[in-house]
């Protein structure tokens, strides 16, 4: 049932490594268990409040391009794709079974261009190769017609706790003041 599926998802999210969700090439969940002594599995008040808010929301599961038909002046898109790897050791792009390589990044840029033409607002986030000093200007090249702002975000998921902390990311948008 839908309730059982949602319950199992919440359980996995609360008990797996840092609440990470990813699947292997077969589409199977493959995150190791976390090392929690007493994880808080269910926050009843929060679940009920979120459930009430979601009654007015349509959630779609599928390719981002399928939402293009909804793009209008009243639409706001926040796009948080798999981030472009900054190094060979950070090349994990497989939260989904199909991955998200440079060609997918370009397909996302094309999507952003089309929804912007329909007067929809979008904000996309990604890794920052320039801020990471790799010198790569991939995003500046493909998103040259949009605004790019650098921000710092806290990263809590990393196998090496010493590598957790603030990292530079980019916000790409078709609105003036990010």
Features from the language model and the residues they span:
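Short, flexible, glycine/charge-rich loop motifs used to bind or transfer phosphoryl groups or to couple energy/partner
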Residues: 47-50, 66-68, 111-112, 138-139, ...
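Short glycine-/acidic-enriched loop or helix-start segments at secondary-structure transitions
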Residues: 88-89, 133-134, 160
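SAM-dependent nucleic-acid methyltransferase catalytic core
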Residues: 1-78, 82-93, 107
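Conserved Class I SAM-dependent methyltransferase catalytic core
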Residues: 104-154
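Class I S-adenosyl-L-methionine
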Residues: 142-178
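A residue-level signal for conserved active-site and pocket-lining positions in enzyme catalytic cores
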Residues: 10, 122, 172
């Amino acid at each position: 049932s839908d309730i059982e599926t949602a319950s199992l998802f919440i359980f996995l999210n609360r008990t797996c490594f840092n609440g990470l969700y990813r699947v292997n090439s077969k589409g199977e969940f493959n995150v190791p268990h976390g090392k929690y002594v007493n994880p808080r599995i269910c926050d009843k008040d929060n679940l009920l409040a979120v459930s009430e808010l979601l009654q007015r929301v349509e959630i779609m599961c599928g390719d981002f391009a399928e939402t293009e038909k909804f793009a209008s002046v009243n639409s706001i898109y926040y796009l948080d794709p798999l981030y472009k790897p900054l190094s060979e050791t950070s090349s994990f792009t497989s939260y989904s079974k199909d991955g998200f390589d440079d060609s997918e990044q370009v397909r996302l840029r094309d999507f952003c261009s089309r929804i912007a033409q329909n007067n929809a607002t979008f904000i996309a986030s990604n890794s920052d190769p320039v801020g990471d000093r790799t010198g790569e200007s991939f995003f500046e090249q493909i998103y040259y017609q949009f605004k790019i702002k650098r921000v710092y975000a806290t990263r809590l998921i990393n196998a090496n706790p010493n590598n957790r902390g603030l990292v530079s990311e980019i916000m790409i948008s078709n609105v003036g003041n990010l």
